[in-house]
Amino acid sequence: MTELFIDGAWVAGSGPVFASRNPGTDEIAWQGESASAADVDRAVASARRAFAGWSALDFESRCAIVKRFAALLNERKEAIAAAIGRETGKPLWEARTEVASMAAKVGISIQAYQERTGEKRQDMADGVAVLRHRPHGVVAVFGPYNFPGHLPNGHIVPALIAGNAVVFKPSELAPGVARATVEVWKEAGLPDGVLNLVQGEKDTGIALANHRQIDGLFFTGSSDTGTLLHKQFGGRPEIVLALEMGGNNPLVIGEVEDIDAAVHHTIQSAFLSAGQRCTCARRIFVPQGAFGDRFLARLTDVTSKITADVFDADPQPFMGAVISARAAAKLVDAQSRLIEQGAKPIIAMTQRDPRLGFVNAAIVDVTGVANLPDEEHFGPLAQIVRYATFDDAIERANDTAFGLSAGLLADDAKTWEHFRRTIRAGIVNWNRPTNGASSAAPFGGTGRSGNHRPSAYYAADYCAYPMASVESTQLTLPASLSPGLHF
């Protein structure tokens, strides 16, 4: 089994065999050997050798290869979407949008690099000031399972455009998607060693993160893992560390005219991708009183009709399975703990089959929980908080160490102005789902949600460092000398 990609060739790993499974059927989706520490070392060494030639290649030539990659993605959309669905449980309709986002990332990243970095010149009295941007060198990219194509692609594409070489460690739950993506890069003509793939579980990740020859690490994943990485690199200022982590995201519901629109946006916020988006709403703030009761009744009615099925079902479901049977069981356990603390189930979550990742979209009222845990439950588990005043809702919405996304559904512009001024989050939406984001804007959050904007439009900022120069084409003695100098 040759599942590692090192120095332009598919090779076998020397670590333990592991497998990924389709969470909707429990069938093996991929199997292969993991990368040992020695394999990781070879991958990093390959990237280091390739870096000099790749970074010396002119910008237009690098972009030509990356554009070819985008074109091939579009040609292979169905095959890659099927790979995504098979390993993650994501329905095909949604997996197709992920592949489309991967291709669109190329044009956005090229534009961002030119606008936010590139080269700038300004005349001076005795020369010219030049600002250029240089790639860091070898960067490690750690990908998550929820968007195994799109999210690592959001690191890899801008890193390559800037001239870096990459060692890619995907989630052990979605290695097949990573292989399919790297195959497209190879066909696009990427030079040997510029992109290397190391498959594996925890030990592979540790070997890569600890490697002394990486110049940067770009991570998307859980807050717990990201925090450990932050501690690990605390004494290494030479490493550029970009972390995009999770959120305990609030959605505040105002007394709106169109209750169905509010319910739709709430369901999209809480249950899209089976709740496995870092920007999904975890806490739904609903006003006390008659309007809140009507909203909650309608939300319950529509949510109870949401279907979950295998990724390629016909007709297509709104939700697929969550990433694994283990993840499904953890979500049910999280619900049980909330109920023990005083939460009231409105729609209780159950796991359909202990071997599979199917859970239903669930709603629990946590208003009566005295000390609500500040935790991200990564799945379709919506927590309802009833509020008395709008300021009370904002205060409780901000009562989190995270700060990724937040949303307000309200008809009044003044209410929105107050909300956006006082809420604490990196992505703040009005009358749109919390997981709606523009690729033309930075993506990321505050607090425990991350330390940079490691994807979307600001990705260029951390893929290259600024190099300032003062230049003159001629070496001449100044017309006026400093005091004490005699020529």
UniProtKB/Swiss-Prot annotation:
Keyword terms: Arginine metabolism, NAD, Oxidoreductase
Gene3D superfamilies in UniProt: Aldehyde Dehydrogenase, Chain A, domain 1, Aldehyde Dehydrogenase, Chain A, domain 2
Pathway membership: Amino-acid degradation; L-arginine degradation via AST pathway; L-glutamate and succinate from L-arginine: step 4/5
PROSITE patterns assigned to the protein according to its UniProt record, in alphabetical order: ALDEHYDE_DEHYDR_CYS, ALDEHYDE_DEHYDR_GLU
Any one biological process term the GO annotation gives: arginine catabolic process to glutamate
Active site: 244, 278
Catalytic reaction equation(s): N-succinyl-L-glutamate 5-semialdehyde + NAD(+) + H2O = N-succinyl-L-glutamate + NADH + 2 H(+)
InterPro entries (alphabetical): Ald_DH/histidinol_DH, Ald_DH_C, Ald_DH_CS_CYS, Ald_DH_CS_GLU, Ald_DH_N, Aldehyde_DH_dom, SuccinylGlu_semiald_DH_AstD
Residues noted as binding NAD(+) in the record, renumbered to the chain: 221-226
Keyword field contains Plastid: no
Coiled coil: none
One Pfam entry name: Aldedh
Family membership: Belongs to the aldehyde dehydrogenase family. AstD subfamily.
Protein name listed in UniProt: N-succinylglutamate 5-semialdehyde dehydrogenase
